[in-house]
Amino acid sequence: MTEITAKTPWAGHTGDVPLHLDYFDGSMFEALELVAKKYPRNIAFDFMGKPTTYPQMIEEIKKCARSLKTIGVRAGDKVTIAMPNCPQAIYMFYAVNLVGGIANMIHPLSAEKEIEFYLNESESVTAITLDQFYNKFESIRQNTKVVNIIIASVKDELSKPVRAGYMLTEGRKIAKIPKDAPVIRWKEFMNMGKACFWNYSVKRTGDDPAVILYSGGTTGTTKGIVLTNRNFNALGQQIIAANPMFNPGDKMLAAMPLFHGFGLGVCVHTMLSQGGRCILVPRFTAKSYAKLITKYHCNFIAGVPTLYEALLRLPSMEGADLSSLKGVFSGGDSLSIELKKKLDKFLYAHGAPVQVREGYGTTETVTACCLTPPHMFKEGSIGVPFPDTYIKIVEPGTDQEVPYGTEGEILLAGPTVMKEYMKHPDETAQTLRRHADGLTWVYTGDLGTMDSEGFVYFRGRAKRMIVSSGYNVYPGQIENILDANEMVQMSCVIGIPDAYRMQKVKAFVKLAAGIPANDATRQALMSYCSKHIAKYAMPCDIEFRDELPKTLVGKVAYRVLEEEEQAKHAAETPAAPAEEEKK
């Protein structure tokens, strides 16, 4: 075994958190099954007021696995899951793992062309989605190799009183699927397992691929990140070790989506593999989030800065009792020092005995791999690494470490590092590099510093990326879509300041000769974008320019446009009163 010689300046500053752990080497499902046997009376998750125990969950997962086997899903097959946070998504995710398949997790609100790309890139043989998204899947199905589409409905997992209300409101808006549609409905699918009389369980180890999540990687082009059983199981153990105050049965509000590493890895798998209880939130609104925190007396909540900004403004939170909270985590985007101060003050005023703890990570490491320790806060820091995780700061693109306090590229290593980029060996080799210290490092493309006690400070993204409400938006992808339109000669996409989302997407377009720069053209381009771009990545505005600024080598100077927008935003933002400035 190679000796690890990487520096660990954070040793001695992690409090009760150990530096090393012994990791479970089985599958994700096996981790759940062990916990279910250990805590047979514990509730695994709640959905719209309906609780499900660990034994009930395991039984449903096994039924789902038998049904997958019956329709022909085999070891190594990819199954696309395009679902919100709901019970069927949980059952399918772990059932795919149980039969030895790989879960391909995608956003259910993705545009049709994006869905087609995800299905083909992963070579999925089966897909599951909700009834309200049926038309998107059916319209592109013939362009893929998908054999079976399983259609679930939220109403199937609701208690009778809640179901009645749902059918009178949200359920009425969903178009009925034709009876002869070539799909398998969830209830029908789950009954298919009764025909499975052979072994449906496939033995898997920690090193086996288990999940595909999507990210722009180091270049901004969408690619699948292949993650293993060990990646997820290790993350679960690390999260619990980094939070010694956790007890089995503690409740986490699971509002972050399942196609996101944090939602899947922390809010769901960490809790379910460690005996916790997930409060599943199928559709996020700040109002519903706030209501659930107090209704269930949640112990842990996690979100992006946008979410917390919204919570501060909610009238319903004025008298809320937050004394049950043990951990409040922020990630997905940089948390400003001022917002953290406001949040900490808000938590204190509402009886919470904790402060916001900021973390940092990438999809290449599932999600967070460092976190502010519970006993020690440093202003502006994103914390220290999890057990067995290593972080170092180097001259960008090299293996040369920079002195403490000097800005450089953030590199990550540890048990949650991805297996590879699917079908992109060159980018895998560019992102994962073995060093003389015995570790394989992820080159994040992000800039930061580290102090002499091992605390890390995030400084910015070296790669061009917009973070809007915690979602990663890659300008290059949107520019490619715009440039493909015959009305467009050239485009440039940037992120502009937004009080709620932190950043929103704006497109600058140079139109093709003869195309009028008017509202009709703008609306036509917006309509075109809506068919090709997910809602969270849609431009909020398209501004027409006769020419786009260029760099000396002829590239579009996006930084010039960013500076223009920042100056415009600063001019529109009222200055603080003199009295406040003195404070």
Task: Outline where the language-model segments fall.
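Gly/Ser/Thr-rich phosphate-binding loop
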Residues: 298-303, 312-379, 390
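Conserved AMP-binding/adenylate-forming core of the ANL superfamily
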Residues: 41-86, 90-94, 111-116
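Conserved pre-ATP/AMP-binding loop-to-beta segment of ANL
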Residues: 176-214, 221, 244-251
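Conserved ATP/PPi-binding loop(s) of AMP-dependent carboxylate-activating enzymes
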Residues: 384-388, 400-433, 473
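AMP-binding/adenylate-forming catalytic core of the ANL superfamily
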Residues: 110, 127-129, 301, 414, ...
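Conserved structural elements of the adenylate-forming
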Residues: 58-63, 191-194, 206, 225-247, ...
